[in-house]
Swiss-Prot record:
Keyword Glycoprotein (UniProt): no
Name of the protein described by the UniProt record: Arginine decarboxylase proenzyme
Function: Specifically catalyzes the decarboxylation of L-arginine to agmatine. Has no S-adenosylmethionine decarboxylase (AdoMetDC) activity.
GO biological process terms on file: arginine catabolic process; polyamine biosynthetic process
Source organism of this protein record: Pyrobaculum calidifontis (strain DSM 21063 / JCM 11548 / VA1)
EC number: 4.1.1.19
Assigned protein family: Belongs to the prokaryotic AdoMetDC family. Type 1 subfamily.
Cofactor: pyruvate
Top-level taxonomic group: Archaea
Record-annotated site: Cleavage (non-hydrolytic): 73-74
GO molecular function (one): arginine decarboxylase activity
Subunit architecture: Heterooctamer of four alpha and four beta chains arranged as a tetramer of alpha/beta heterodimers.
Amino acid sequence: MQATAQVQTPVVGRHVYGELYGVDESLLKDEERLRRIVIEAAHIANMHLVEVNSWKFKGGDKEGVSVIALVLESHIAIHTWPVYNFATVDVYTCGEHSDPMAAFRYIVSQLNPKRFTVNYSDRSYK
């Protein structure tokens, strides 16, 4: 009897996230537009959309919108604080053929911040 070697595929995890400053307040309140931006970002990044949920929060400095897309490869999230013209973006993928940086760049291009930060973390199993 011959033993067969099992080849394990490593977990490929890439996380791109950042903060966007100086974004137009009305855009940060527009739940439907933010949903469309996240959906298009998933397509651009070659991610497979499973579901998108969003919530609009009211109440002073806590007012804002959160959009979270569950993708087969992981998730995309935007959280906004319109009173501060501020948003955070989180794109995580464990898919070898998806491009989280492309999704992040698209979201930034659509939100058009005055400035932004971007961070990258390799979260792969090694």
